């Protein structure tokens, strides 16, 4: 039987996506990345069809001996590159990781302090997201506008007065590190726990260009495995031997996860090995690129946030585009030119402006993995200028983008010799390996 039209449509859409985002666009979404061909090859395996409720070697299903092995190996590898003692890879996203931690630390009606939304707090930290769904009251710590960060002195006073169950640091618009070591002693002094959401910066932490929150006093760290850490989409939880981790790990199943999408595990393990060998050079290039892009945009007349602080210490760059029509309009205009960014609230925006905020959030981690360096950041800034300031024909700029991408199609910071995979081929299953 030949393919029905519906199936042809599915295949056409999938192919179009692959061609467009893998070969024709500048992918500058700060929460995305790309796996290596090696990691993708193990992502497509029999694990994607299987279940494994519970922890390794303590499953509720049979047939999990290789799942136990790969999950244990992946956790060991992640602990090694993170310099941590505990890892749980069962959360299927960073938000699920947050939910699992928040639920253990507080009951409905309890209070939690979070980094101010202006300093980048993720929606899962707020009443609009996971905290609200769990019935936990969120109170924002004071904002230091000059440093685009938590106001340390005022936050300490608030911690002492409120005595929350826990405090959350980390964010989604995250240019500069939050004050973990400054706040940790005061959090612990009132009997609270310090949670660090490192979803965006985990790859920078294991790459040693961003301080480790666990070494600075955080009790527990949640992450995503697909942002600056370029693995499969998923979440993880780390600690340095805290009792909180044990409590969370006991309740992830059955509270928040049943099966935990086992095909993630070998791909996460492969990415951890890649980052063991290439992570530091990758993270260093990411931060050099973000700084270079910020400076290049500023030189071309854009209002880049954080000038007095050197613009950024992460993979992100934030740009105020109000004078050009706002974040919603400009993000769509850039997409027409095959430049993919997202609109984003800036520190002075009101939360209700989320649909049309002042700014753009730009992330350089994916294009860095394709091999781009500082000189390409200059080119990207020039493309922004052509679209936004010079108002060039977006179709002409799109041609330039596609032409630029022709030289950056191969994933870097990985192992090159794919021929070594041949001996692991599972041809009878028609899988890559």
Curated annotation (Swiss-Prot):
The modification N6-(pyridoxal phosphate)lysine is found at residue 227. Its cofactor is pyridoxal 5'-phosphate. The keyword Signal does not apply. GO terms for molecular function: glycine hydroxymethyltransferase activity; pyridoxal phosphate binding. Its EC number is 2.1.2.-. (6S)-5,6,7,8-tetrahydrofolate binds at residues 121-123, 243. It is an enzyme of class 2 (transferase). The keyword Cell membrane does not apply. It comes from the Archaea. Keywords: Amino-acid biosynthesis, Cytoplasm, One-carbon metabolism, Pyridoxal phosphate, Transferase. GO terms for biological process: glycine biosynthetic process from serine; tetrahydrofolate interconversion. One of its GO terms (cellular component) is cytoplasm. Pathway: Amino-acid biosynthesis; glycine biosynthesis; glycine from L-serine: step 1/1. It is found in: Cytoplasm. Homodimer. NCBIfam families: PRK00011.1. Catalyzes the reversible interconversion of serine and glycine with a modified folate serving as the one-carbon carrier. Also exhibits a pteridine-independent aldolase activity toward beta-hydroxyamino acids, producing glycine and aldehydes, via a retro-aldol mechanism. This is Serine hydroxymethyltransferase. It comes from Saccharolobus islandicus (strain M.16.27) (Sulfolobus islandicus). The gene is glyA.
């Amino acid at each position: 039987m030949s393919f029905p039209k519906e199936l042809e449509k599915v295949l056409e859409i999938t192919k179009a996506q692959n061609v467009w985002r893998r070969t024709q666009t500048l992918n500058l979404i700060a929460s995305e990345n790309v796996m290596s061909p090696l990691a993708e090859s193990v992502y497509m395996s029999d694990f994607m069809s299987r279940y494994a409720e519970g922890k390794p070697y303590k499953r509720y299903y049979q047939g999990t001996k290789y799942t136990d092995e790969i999950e244990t190996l992946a956790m060991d590898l992640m602990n090694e590159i993170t310099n941590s003692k505990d890892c749980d890879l069962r959360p299927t996203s960073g938000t699920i990781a947050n939910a699992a931690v928040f639920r253990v630390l507080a009951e409905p009606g309890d209070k939690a302090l979070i980094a101010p939304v202006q300093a980048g707090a993720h929606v899962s930290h707020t009443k609009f997201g996971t905290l609200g769904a769990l019935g936990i009251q969120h109170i924002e710590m004071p904002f230091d506008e000059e440093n685009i960060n938590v106001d340390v002195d005022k936050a300490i006073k608030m911690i002492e007065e409120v005595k929350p169950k826990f405090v959350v640091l980390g964010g989604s618009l995250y240019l500069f590190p939050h004050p973990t070591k400054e706040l940790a002693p005061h959090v612990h002094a009132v009997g609270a726990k310090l949670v660090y959401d490192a979803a965006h910066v985990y790859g920078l932490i294991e790459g040693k260009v961003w301080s480790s929150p666990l070494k600075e006093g955080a009790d527990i760290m949640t992450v995503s495995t697909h942002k600056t850490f370029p693995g499969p989409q998923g979440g993880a939880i780390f600690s340095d031997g805290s009792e909180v981790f044990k409590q969370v790990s006991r309740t992830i199943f059955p509270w928040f996860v049943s099966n935990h999408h086992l095909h993630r595990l070998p791909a996460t393990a492969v990415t951890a090995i890649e980052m063991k060998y290439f992570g530091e050079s990758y993270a260093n290039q990411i931060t050099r690129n973000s700084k270079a892009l910020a400076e290049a945009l500023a030189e071309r007349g854009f209002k880049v946030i954080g000038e007095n602080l050197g613009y950024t210490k992460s993979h992100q760059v934030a740009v105020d585009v109000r004078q050009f029509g706002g974040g919603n309009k400009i993000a769509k205009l850039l997409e027409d030119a095959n430049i993919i960014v997202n609109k984003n609230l800036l520190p002075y925006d009101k939360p209700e402006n989320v649909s049309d905020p002042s700014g753009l959030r730009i992330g350089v981690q994916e294009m860095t993995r394709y091999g781009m360096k500082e000189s390409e950041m200059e080119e990207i800034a020039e493309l922004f200028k052509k679209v936004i300031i010079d108002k060039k024909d977006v179709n002409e700029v799109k041609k330039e983008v596609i032409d630029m991408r022709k030289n950056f199609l191969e994933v870097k910071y990985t192992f090159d010799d794919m021929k070594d995979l041949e001996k692991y081929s599972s041809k009878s299953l028609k899988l890559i390996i």
